[in-house]
Amino acid sequence: MWWYDHPVGGRRPYLVLTRDEALPVLNRILGVPATRTVRDIPTEVPLDQTDGMPLACALTLDNLEPIQIALCTEKITRLSPERMAMVCTALAAATACGAPAQ
């Protein structure tokens, strides 16, 4: 989790999904914004202070977007393997990956 200085939305937490090995060679990476609006939907992952976040929030994998690595200004925390498993499940729900072909 990083503080990201979004050009439009201002400073907010983002989860960086791009693998560590690719970061040195990319200008844009995949990020997921955190929001204080929690809707309890399958594409969300709730986070709180026990995860190292300053406030309770949720990652909404429906809002996955490319972000500029240069605007990731400060590391907040590293999510646990359990939370990252939840992120993978929410990402699969957001993209319908793993759903039977129709």
Residue ranges with predicted function:
Residues 1-5:
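Short coil-to-beta transition motif at edge beta-strands of beta-rich domains
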Residues 10-49:
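Compact nucleic-acid interaction/catalytic patches
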Residues 8-11, 81:
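Alpha-helix initiation and capping sites
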Residues 51-102:
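C-terminal terminal-subdomain/extension
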Residues 7, 20, 64:
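Anionic group-transfer/hydrolysis microenvironments
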